[in-house]
């Protein structure tokens, strides 16, 4: 048995999807279910302040869609031997605190970011200690956010900015009655 623990997938294209626009990957940006990176990129594309919940000290793991596909291939080609323990792979290539991710997107896009109340009941700061050494030792050559492919998803956000439902961007589902919506004052 092989168990893949997956980080947040970013990116919209693989070599196969680049052949036909109809094959593009989903790009969920809403505040409740979309990924934080997609939300930041869509906010930047429409001039909406990037919303960082709480302190933004929550650490998340990320992996580009091409690397995710490669990791599945590597896992399939390297199964555990019969009778061995479950093989666990961490399917991620890097980790970032949410506020650092906001700073990266703000720097690339020229957008501001705002700290807003955290609508979730979670620690204000956390460290994510995770390793993908097994994938690296089996040939994964990771794609990092800062290597320019982030431009790929920024371009997708800009291309479809006219389709954005601004009301879906803020996180409005509250985890407890003590939480507040994640809406910036100037949005």
Mark where each language-model region is.
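Short-chain dehydrogenase/reductase
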Residues: 27-38, 61-62
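Short, flexible micro-motifs
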Residues: 10, 14, 37, 57-59
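Short glycine-rich loop/turn motifs that provide flexible caps or phosphate-binding loops at active sites
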Residues: 6, 10, 33, 46, ...
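C-terminal substrate-binding subdomain of Rossmann-fold SDR/epimerase-dehydratase oxidoreductases
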Residues: 42-187
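Conserved beta-loop-beta element that borders a ligand/cofactor-binding pocket
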Residues: 1-27, 51
């Amino acid at each position: 048995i092989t168990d893949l623990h997956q980080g947040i997938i970013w990116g919209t294209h693989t070599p196969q999807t680049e052949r036909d626009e109809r094959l593009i990957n989903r790009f969920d940006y809403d505040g409740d279910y979309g990924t934080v990176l997609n939300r930041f990129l869509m906010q930047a594309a429409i001039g909406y302040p990037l919303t960082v919940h709480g302190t933004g000290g929550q650490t998340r793991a990320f992996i580009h869609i091409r690397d995710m596909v490669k990791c599945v291939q590597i896992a399939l080609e390297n199964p555990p031997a019969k009778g061995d323990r479950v093989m666990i792979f961490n399917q991620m290539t890097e980790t970032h605190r949410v506020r650092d991710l906001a700073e990266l997107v703000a720097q690339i896009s020229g957008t501001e970011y705002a700290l807003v109340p955290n609508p979730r009941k979670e620690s204000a700061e956390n460290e994510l200690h995770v390793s993908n050494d097994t994938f690296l030792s089996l040939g994964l050559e990771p794609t990092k956010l800062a290597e320019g492919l982030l431009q790929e998803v920024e371009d997708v956000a800009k291309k479809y900015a006219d389709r954005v439902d601004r009301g879906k961007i803020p996180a409005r589902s509250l985890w407890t009655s003590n939480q507040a919506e994640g809406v910036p004052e100037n949005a």
